[in-house]
């Protein structure tokens, strides 16, 4: 017979209260159980000592007999120091998706182009002759205007 240590839900609607029970794995969640070894009240504060109440001696006994705890109960057992929980590692979960990678590459390309433009030597020598040409044109314009004024006066 496969035995598991799991939570059996009790309490009213929207007011959950769980018993930590040892039960046959084939029995319903809230159905028959072999032994109640604790309680879990998720409505209490996380630092409240009554949030998880566990009979560690009975939990150790059932684990030695071969009972398999569910994930949530395994967390409680780990917190109580009864059984160490295996650390899970899923590095692919944190890896960004394909579209996010494409956006990051585009952003990196834009930044690289902006840095190249900023680091490239500015074309100041080419800009200075253009400024000189404008001053020369401006110097010629008053002479032409003066000539135009003289011709209209005559």
From Swiss-Prot:
UniProt name for this protein: Small ribosomal subunit protein bS16
Top-level taxon: Bacteria
Swiss-Prot/TrEMBL keywords: Ribonucleoprotein, Ribosomal protein
Residue ranges, compositional bias (Basic and acidic residues): 92-109
Acidic residues compositional bias, start-end: 142-154
One Pfam family named in its UniProt record: Ribosomal_S16
Gene3D superfamilies referenced in this protein's UniProt entry, alphabetically: 3.30.1320.10
GO cellular component terms attached to this protein's record: cytoplasm; small ribosomal subunit
HAMAP family the UniProt entry points to: Ribosomal_bS16 (MF_00385)
KW Ribosomal protein (keyword) present: yes
Record region (Disordered): 82-154
Gene Ontology BP terms: translation
Keyword Nucleotide-binding set for record: no
Composition skew (Low complexity), residue ranges: 110-129
GO molecular function: structural constituent of ribosome
Family according to the record: Belongs to the bacterial ribosomal protein bS16 family.
Gene behind this protein: rpsP
């Amino acid at each position: 017979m496969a035995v598991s240590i799991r939570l059996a839900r009790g309490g009213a609607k929207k007011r959950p209260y769980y018993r930590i029970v040892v039960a046959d794995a084939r029995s319903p969640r809230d159905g028959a159980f072999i032994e109640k070894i604790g309680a879990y009240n998720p409505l209490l504060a996380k630092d409240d000592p009554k949030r998880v109440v566990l009979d560690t001696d009975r939990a150790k006994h059932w684990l030695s007999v071969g009972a398999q705890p569910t994930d949530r109960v395994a967390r409680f057992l780990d917190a109580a120091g009864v059984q160490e929980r295996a650390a899970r590692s899923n590095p692919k979960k944190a890896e960004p998706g394909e579209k996010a990678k494409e956006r990051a590459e585009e952003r990196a390309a834009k930044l690289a182009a902006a840095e190249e433009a900023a680091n490239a030597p500015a074309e100041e020598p080419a800009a200075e002759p253009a400024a000189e040409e404008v001053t020369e044109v401006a110097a010629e314009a008053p002479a032409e205007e003066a000539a135009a004024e003289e011709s209209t006066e005559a």
